[in-house]
Every structure is written in C-alpha cells, then in structure tokens.
C-alpha cells in the first residue's frame, strides 16, 4: 500500500438523502454507519452469508432479506444516522476544543502506521493494541477521546466501541483527517490510498 498526497480529492456529500433506489455503495458513502445499523437490527451486511453487493439497491437488499418493508428500513437508517451525528465532532469544533488552554484531549488515530507517519494531526497518537488496552482499562472514564481515521468511515465504529466500554466522552472526527485538512489546517496534506497489484 502506498499513500499518495493529493490536494484535489472529491468532497463527500454532506446531506444524505436515501431511498429504495439508493445503491449500497451510495448508502455507505452517505452514512458511514449504515452497515453497522443494518447488521444490528436486521443481520444484513456483517458476514458473507448476509452480505450485499455495492451495486444492489436498498430495495433489492430488503426484498431478498425476508421482504423487509423498505420504509421501516429507511426509518431505521435515518434514526441510526441521527445517533451517529451525536457521537461525531466536526473539524472546526475539534479545533476550538484543541485551542482551549486547559484541554486534556486524547487524539487516537486508527489509520495504518504508513498513513499516520505520512500525515497526522499534531498531538495525535496511533492506535495500537497496547494503547487500546490501556485506554479501555486504565484511562479515566471521563477522558475526552477523539477517534480519527482517513475520511470518517471507520471511526464511528471505534467510537461506539469505546463508548460501550464506558469512555462516554468519546467521539469520532466527522470526515476524518481529510475533513480536518480541508476545513481547519490546509498544511496537513490530503491523500488517497492506492493498492499496488502483487
């Protein structure tokens, strides 16, 4: 894997509108926590037997999963997205918190070591298994913890995991380090990942 710096990445859509015709790929781009929400309630998308193809629509997935009522699934996804918003912080609000003098914030970066070493928010730490174990077992449960990834698609799951283990002041950085670079600190280079063929 190589990390490429790129100052012209497309921005993610910020106003999710979903329908039965929305593809699963579009859904996951609009609502990064959608797979988690579908699996938690309907056992869809969590494993090979209940998976879906990115090109399938929500309606098609509902039909082949016991003909689930599409409207009910859409309401559940909307409710889940609202919950996800509550455990996110946007880049400008994070900057305000970091600029406060007596702030004790832990910035945990869950990207690969290669990504982290190429581009990082000052003061952040790469999440290792040892650091995760320390955080969950030894940190004060009131510790303000920010989970950072590349574009915000994986950090929600980790934030929910930390909250589930009692670190209730944990949030995910909405849009990840990419959003932080765009909205707060243009000195942090933007990048894209390319997987080289074997």
Where are the language model's segments positioned?
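N-terminal amphipathic/basic-hydrophobic helices that include classical n-h-c signal peptides
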Residues: 1-11
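Short, surface-exposed ligand- or partner-binding patches at beta-edge/loop junctions that are enriched
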Residues: 148-149
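Rhodanese-like catalytic fold shared by cysteine-dependent sulfurtransferases
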Residues: 9, 13-45, 51-105, 113-144, ...
